[in-house]
Amino acid sequence: MALFLARHTLSGTGAGCHGRGPAPDVSEVDLTLQALGERGFSRLLDLGLACLDLSYVEMREFVVWGRPPASEAAVASTPGSLFRSHSSAYWLSEVERPGGLVRWARSQTSPSSLTLAPHLGPSLLSLSVVTGGGCGAVAFCNAFFLAYFLVVRSVFPAFSDRIAAWICDRSPFCENTRAVARGYRGLVKRFLAFVFERSSYDPPLLRQNSRPVERCFAIKNYVPGLDSQSCVTVPSFSRWAQSHASELDPREIRDRVTPATAPSFVADHASALLASLQKKASDTPCGNPIQWMWYRLLVNSCLRSAHCLLPIPAVSEGGRKTGGGVGEELVGAGGPCLSRDVFVAIVSRNVLSCLLNVPAAGPRAYKCFRSHASRPVSGPDYPPLAVFCMDCGYCLNFGKQTGVGGRLNSFRPTLQFYPRDQKEKHVLTCHASGRVYCSNCGSAAVGCQRLAEPPSARSGWRPRIRAVLPHNAAYELDRGSRLLDAIIPCLGPDRTCMRPVVLRGVTVRQLLYLTLRTEARAVCSICQQRQAPEDARDEPHLFSSCLEVELPPGERCAGCRLYQTRYGTPAAQAHPPGEAGGGFSRQSPAS
């Protein structure tokens, strides 16, 4: 739809115009809208602001920042305001409320109010005829939208063509007050989405973030764009091979030109590749990737090998080398000694540990790993799981909920389990990548071990019982009288229970022979308070082992089969539970 007016003279009492009398000639506005230029849009903006009784500065502040002018400044700037009791700041604030625009328009166009400012009536009538927007409150709403759109055009002149197309195609913007009964934001959202080619754009145009610090922390949740300046420029091997295809054998190109058979210029290419990587790696913000790659390659190679020979980097306090290997040390570009880092990493992996293997010296080590619906052996909470850092050797799940129903996986933290620095060791999770890190050293090498494992070929067909220490100095236990605190699985008469139990003040010697007999401190509180069923012969107990429910030999778990081979029939089969020698009594069954 095109706006229409060509040297028009307005007069008369149009319907809904309340008989305001003859209007001044507005023929100076040349508005055959195909011929609208900058002067025509400026005249339209002046007419719209005159109808709204607002200045350009006030309207621009409202459109750009969404804030009305101060009440005092508005009253001073418009001495002949349409409403003597309310300033423009009041009505611009009223527009933000649901239905505020319609209330403002109706009050502005009421006959009793227009008599206070008779110069506004002709401006509104002129703009109504220009835009075809009707009279009364509807014309006032169209004047508000036209002024809003033209202010956006003056603020963003680069989008003037799209804004002009919107004004020409969509005028009048509302044909009745019901279209804007809920407010002006719906139409303005569609206008801004069309102009800026966005799926959604809420007014105002600019917004100030009231929490800039929190927004900086949330930047990691967004995927940043590729920065060409941060890319490492390296020679392309494929282009080099194509350019030297006539000089190389096809098999050498296929095998990526091994150094043994490569021509002399291959070494030049390798040198150029290394030089370009070193040039870019020296000032990379994330560190030196070349040194880190060498470090990971050397550490992984030594850890996977059965034996490795490491130079001892003996360095004095002054930084001068006083001993160690005969050859030169591996030093990265601008970085510290690489051999020292590799030495520390490998030695810490092989020395620092928080786990002890308790010898399976007695029947209490042979647990039943029978799985049923109420207690899946392969579940996340049974047997208890120890999460530890493979670099610093600390246990990371003291008092932490790990997995579904993680009460059996978390060890209650006590003062004994915060050694030296009294710092709680736990796992940090990256919300961007999902990787876990050690809170003590920042390593991503996190391992898991069950405190109880069934017999297998890997363990020499012997069960494994592990104890978790509060520190990472398991190799420091050099004598049998050394006192320590540890967490072990339950070693009570119930062979199916493996809940974690805290042992305090136990010696190394007592820990070595802990599986020979049942000790009260090695039994969990649930097993100590458990009552026997009334008749276990008719209905097997929920926590009965494979031998107690008399499963066929082929369906028994590895722990029960090995237990029967070594110790025969358990006492729970010979005596009913609850009686002397029974599996649920406080006495240990005969071995």
Swiss-Prot record:
Region (Disordered) residue spans: 571-591
Statement: the UniProt record of this protein carries the keyword rRNA-binding: no
Alphabetically ordered keywords of this record: Early protein
GO CC term (a single one): viral tegument
Listed GO biological process terms: viral process
Superkingdom of this protein's organism: Viruses
Coiled-coil spans in chain: none
Similarity comment: family membership: Belongs to the Epstein-Barr virus BFRF2 family.
Subunit structure comment from the entry: Part of a trimeric complex composed of BGLF3, BFRF2 and BVLF1.
Function description: Part of the viral pre-initiation complex (vPIC) that is responsible for the expression of vPIC-dependent late genes. vPIC is composed of at least BcRF1 that binds the viral TATT box, BDLF3.5, BDLF4, BFRF2, BGLF3, BGLF4 and BVLF1.
Protein name: Late gene expression regulator BFRF2
Organism: Epstein-Barr virus (strain B95-8) (HHV-4)
Classification lineage: Viruses, Duplodnaviria, Heunggongvirae, Peploviricota, Herviviricetes
